[in-house]
């Protein structure tokens, strides 16, 4: 595939006010995307955003660019990323555009695209947009300018879609659930979904102010929800990230349940209810314990590269339905076309209610191996992944853990980080080995 100038593993992302996340570039991006999509006969796209203060500015810039290309725009307002994917399909729009930097701090933002099937835009279309960005921005004649309008019932439509994915003959009336929306795009949606299905809902992270998204709350900061579940004597907790495509859960003891354990619970329930369809896709970061537990159930397991895009690609290749990253991107193609935190939570709650077991009980079949992920910020000229000392240390650790664990070293696709992951049977040993490699990565300039 050709080298990409702008699109990363999850669209275009960066610091607001610095290229490419500037009003000027984003307007030109809207125009370039509009030109490419117009060549496919497009007349309408949808734009949604999370709750970052910069979302208003970038939404206006995109709207102007698409209008200049002659494309009509439907403005969804604050909307979870999977909700934008769903509405893109139901509105028969040619594309859905998400303004979000997901789990990143408020001062970052990004743009990514969904196709008319609610999936991430094909590589060929992204590359065509990149090529168009190299051309001067123009404008269609006045009579052909695109129009923009607000989609006033967007949240209600998505709430009803989520509820339709929960069995109609059962209720959540016996459950008390803490829901943490990370002050993000699900703040006005997730609590209503679970409440309308009968649950008693305790909300946290549902007061966005433009700058508090993901701040000390949500799926990337679990201390608050763990404490709330225990204090309120709740049955469980559901934590979503800023754009709603990532989920973590908490059982009644405050124990944090990640994407590996969530997909295990869903796969087990599918097996028990006769809905098992193929295997499960994880990633290079998935805990070895998941692989072993699924093997015990005679469920196939395959690893993709890190990133929900790669999980989706491998699911399509194998014709399977279930995939997840341990970071909380959970995909169930029986229900959605992309990772969806609310839908994943409903899949788990289906298991809780149908099996009449607590979340604590449902996770007992999976024994997670101790795993440590060390993130090393990196801005040097040389690539640590090619450094001789780092590679020698990785080989040494792999030899030490032969048959008992593994080591993985990779670059983040969205931030200037080198991720060092070590997994093994003993946490003290894992910590020692991970820090040994991380210290060498820090020395690379």
Swiss-Prot record:
Keywords linked to the UniProt accession: Isomerase, Magnesium, Metal-binding, Phosphoprotein
Cofactor note: Binds 1 Mg(2+) ion per subunit.
Ligand binding (Mg(2+)): 102, 241, 243, 245
Residues that span the membrane, as ranges: none
Pfam families: PGM_PMM_I, PGM_PMM_II, PGM_PMM_III, PGM_PMM_IV
InterPro entries: A-D-PHexomutase_a/b/a-I, A-D-PHexomutase_a/b/a-I/II/III, A-D-PHexomutase_a/b/a-II, A-D-PHexomutase_a/b/a-III, A-D-PHexomutase_C, A-D-PHexomutase_C_sf, A-D-PHexomutase_CS, Alpha-D-phosphohexomutase_SF
Similarity section: Belongs to the phosphohexose mutase family.
HAMAP family: GlmM_B
Name the record gives this protein: Phosphoglucosamine mutase
Gene expressing this chain: glmM
């Amino acid at each position: 595939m050709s080298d990409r100038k702008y699109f990363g593993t999850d669209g275009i992302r960066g610091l607001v006010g610095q290229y490419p996340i500037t009003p000027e570039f984003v307007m030109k991006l809207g125009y370039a995307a509009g030109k490419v999509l117009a060549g496919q006969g497009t007349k309408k796209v949808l734009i949604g955003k999370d709750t970052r203060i910069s979302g208003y500015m970038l939404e206006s810039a995109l709207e102007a660019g698409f209008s200049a290309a002659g494309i009509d725009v439907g403005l969804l307002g604050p909307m979870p990323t999977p909700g934008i994917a769903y509405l893109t399909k139901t509105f028969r729009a040619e594309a859905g555009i998400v303004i979000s930097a997901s789990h990143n701090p408020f001062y970052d933002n990004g743009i990514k695209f969904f196709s008319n099937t609610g999936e991430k835009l094909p590589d060929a279309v992204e590359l065509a947009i990149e090529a168009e960005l190299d051309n001067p921005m123009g404008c269609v004649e006045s009579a052909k300018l695109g129009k923009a309008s607000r989609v006033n019932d967007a949240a209600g439509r998505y709430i009803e879609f989520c509820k339709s994915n929960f069995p109609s003959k059962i209720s959540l009336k016996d459950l008390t659930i803490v829901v943490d929306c990370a002050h993000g795009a699900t703040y006005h949606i997730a609590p209503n979904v679970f409440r309308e299905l009968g649950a008693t809902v305790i909300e946290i992270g549902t007061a966005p102010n433009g700058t508090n998204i993901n701040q000390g709350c949500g799926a990337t900061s679990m201390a608050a929800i763990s404490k709330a579940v225990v204090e309120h004597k709740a049955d469980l907790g559901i934590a979503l990230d800023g754009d709603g495509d990532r989920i973590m859960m908490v059982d009644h003891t405050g124990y944090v349940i990640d994407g590996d354990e969530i997909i295990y619970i869903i796969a087990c329930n599918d097996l028990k209810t006769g809905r098992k369809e193929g295997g499960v896709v994880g990633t290079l970061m998935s805990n070895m314990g998941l692989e072993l537990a699924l093997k015990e159930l005679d469920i196939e397991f395959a690893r993709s590269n890190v990133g929900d895009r790669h999980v989706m690609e491998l699911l399509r290749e194998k014709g399977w339905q279930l995939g997840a990253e341990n970071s909380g991107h959970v995909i169930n193609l029986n229900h959605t076309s992309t990772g969806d935190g609310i839908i994943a939570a409903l899949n788990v709650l289906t298991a809780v209610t149908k099996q009449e077991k607590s979340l604590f009980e449902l996770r007992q079949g999976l024994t997670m191996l101790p795993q440590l992920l060390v993130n090393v910020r990196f801005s040097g000229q040389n690539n640590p992944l090619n450094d001789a000392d780092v590679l020698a240390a990785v080989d040494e650790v792999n030899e030490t853990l032969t048959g008992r664990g593994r080591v993985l070293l990779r670059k983040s696709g969205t931030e200037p980080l080198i991720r060092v992951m070590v997994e093994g049977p003993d946490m003290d040993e894992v910590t020692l080995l991970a820090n040994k490699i991380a210290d060498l990565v820090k020395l690379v300039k």
